[in-house]
Design a protein with these regions (language model features):
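Structural preference for solvent-exposed beta-strand-turn elements
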Residues: 1-255
Length: 257
């Protein structure tokens, strides 16, 4: 059973095992269908019935029965198919790290739409092939690298939309899954064995982020990441809602105000 849904910016295609007596296609409201299935008891066997020429989908599960209005399959909008110029594969846990470590810095300002996402691009750093994810809102910046991503060819940097970054979790549940990534001029596609997520990319130019990263710093401090995070969390309890500021006052103390 194939399930396809879209909001014209993102399209998801999933497939599940089913006993199909009569093949066919139809369009039905996704939210209502989801709520019906979600509220059924665990392990329920669900049956979908649609008589030829009928504009209703009958859903039968145990002692429950629902009827939903349908539309012809031709009325369902499908994102235009195209050739993907660049394709490579990464483990699910690697993609999670790229986006989970960078997404907090994405902007929400609609006027600066080119910052509303994560900038993904290949580069060479210290003679090593790198796949880099960058996000910034103009006040903070996150840069995450993975080495030797196995790219057979290079591609120009793309901006993965904020909404797509949020929805990627559905395809990254199993850390050891191989995720195929395909990139074209205006789309990016993530796919595992059963689920495919296709998204438009942001049509804009990401700023030169390297210019704002300080270099030649004369003050450096190396700390245990988890201990530092816990310390910041403790002192931020008394910081103001407006500033949420935490200031290092020495090598051993933090202050919130």
């Amino acid at each position: 059973l194939y399930l396809r849904t879209t909001d014209l910016d993102i399209e998801v295609l999933d497939k599940v095992s089913a006993d199909v007596e009569t093949p066919g296609s139809l369009t039905v409201g996704a939210n209502t269908l989801y709520e019906i299935v979600r509220k059924l008891p665990d392990g329920s066997q669900v049956e979908f019935l649609n008589e030829s020429g009928s504009n209703q989908l009958e859903i039968v599960a145990s002692r429950s029965k629902f009827f939903l209005s349908t539309l012809p399959k031709e009325d369902f909008p499908i994102m235009a198919t195209e050739e993907y110029d660049f394709e490579f594969s990464l483990k699910s846990k690697v993609i999670k790290r790229l986006f989970d470590k960078s997404k907090f810095a994405m902007s929400s300002e609609e006027t600066r739409y080119y910052l509303n996402g994560v900038y993904l691009h290949p580069c060479i750093e210290n003679e090593k092939n790198i796949l880099r994810a960058v996000a910034t809102d103009g006040h903070r910046l996150a840069q995450i690298d993975i080495e030797n991503p196995g790219l057979k060819n290079s591609f120009s940097g793309i901006i993965v939309p904020k909404k797509t970054v949020g929805e990627l979790r559905m395809i990254l549940e199993n850390d050891n899954d191989d995720i195929s990534i395909s990139i074209s001029n205006n789309k990016i596609r993530f796919a595992n064995k059963s689920l495919t997520l296709t998204s438009k990319i942001v049509d804009g130019t990401f700023p030169d982020y390297k210019r704002v990263i300080p270099i030649n710093n004369d003050k450096k401090l190396k700390v245990n990441a988890s201990e530092f995070s816990e310390a910041v969390d403790r002192v931020s309890t008394v910081s103001s809602e407006r500033s949420r500021a935490v200031k290092p006052v020495s090598y051993t103390h933090l202050r919130a105000h």
